[in-house]
């Protein structure tokens, strides 16, 4: 069995601020095959590497990426992070990040397109122009939850490798996993009477579930800006069978990158996608137990926050 490619999610994020040049370099030093990064658009149509639409990374700035200019974002100081001092660290532009990774021997790049909050037909062409200029060629894979943007990129650059990101089953996403219910001591409220004695516990349980659902809804909405809830639900329903969905698309797809629980819902997923010529990545694979569960399925890639440990976990799983 071929060992999966290891892609460091936003770089080595426990050693440096995520999505920074230092995080990318550390990931390769630790043995990752490549890095994943996120590109989004600034107020003045610049292209910056950052995951969330909000500024984070422990800065004192409270603002949205799309409300700031490229220059304002480049001026944000990231030299102090988690008690560690960095000589120079800032949010890289797309051009800077691609040029840097191009110079890291053997480094592949998974570049995620973050859709602009407001429609901008020129967003994808701007990204494609910089991809061409980088010279990364087949070392770059463009991925996104917004598959219409990938289609646009593929039309502009037919040789570009693209991969669709998928979330999996909407119902299974919205509620806490069974193990969490057990760990929190939660029970099905229908198992007991709604009397005064157990109402406080049920109220606490409802609060935890509501908080989980709220967080998941916020996540989903952020992945699909410009879309209504009805449109998002329809989109996710269309993707419930990834292999059938890929075959319905009007452009060729090189990779399907799935939230890893998708494989537990359909253990034949990797085989089904391989049968139609698609490689398969799972994200975000961060524990030994998950590696042990996924490895026998034959995935082509693990996207992970733990590039320091995952090869050890793979070796241990293969030795079992």
Model-derived features with residue positions:
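Phosphate-group recognition and catalysis centered on beta-loop-alpha active-site segments
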Residues: 1-320
């Amino acid at each position: 069995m071929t060992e999966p490619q290891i892609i460091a999610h936003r770089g080595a994020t426990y050693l440096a601020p995520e999505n920074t040049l230092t995080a990318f370099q550390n990931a390769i030093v630790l043995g990752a095959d490549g890095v994943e990064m996120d590109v989004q658009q600034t107020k003045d149509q610049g292209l910056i590497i950052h995951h969330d639409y909000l500024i984070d990374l422990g800065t004192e700035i409270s603002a949205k990426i799309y409300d700031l200019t490229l220059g304002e974002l480049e001026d944000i100081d990231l030299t102090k992070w988690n008690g560690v001092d960095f000589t120079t660290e800032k949010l890289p532009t797309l051009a800077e990040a691609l040029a840097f990774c191009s110079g890291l021997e053997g480094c592949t790049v998974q570049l995620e397109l973050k859709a602009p909050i407001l429609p901008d037909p020129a967003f994808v062409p701007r990204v494609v122009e910089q991809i061409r200029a980088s010279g990364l060629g087949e070392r770059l894979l463009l991925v996104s939850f917004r598959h219409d943007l990938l289609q646009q990129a593929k039309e502009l650059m037919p040789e570009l490798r693209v991969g669709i990101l998928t979330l999996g089953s909407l119902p299974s996403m919205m509620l806490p996993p069974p193990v969490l219910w057990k760990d929190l001591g939660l029970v099905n409220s229908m198992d007991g009477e709604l009397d005064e004695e157990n109402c406080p516990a049920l109220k606490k349980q409802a609060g935890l579930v509501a908080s989980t659902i709220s967080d998941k809804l916020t996540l989903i909405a952020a992945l699909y800006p410009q879309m209504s809830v009805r449109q998002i639900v329809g989109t996710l329903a269309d993707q419930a069978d990834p292999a059938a969905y890929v075959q319905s698309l009007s452009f060729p797809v090189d990779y399907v990158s799935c939230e890893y629980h998708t494989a537990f819902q359909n253990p034949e997923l990797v085989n089904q996608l391989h049968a139609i010529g698609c490689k398969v990545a799972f994200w975000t694979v961060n524990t030994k137990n998950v590696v042990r569960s996924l490895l026998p399925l034959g995935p082509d890639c693990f996207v992970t926050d733990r590039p320091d440990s995952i090869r050890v976990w793979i070796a241990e799983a293969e030795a079992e």
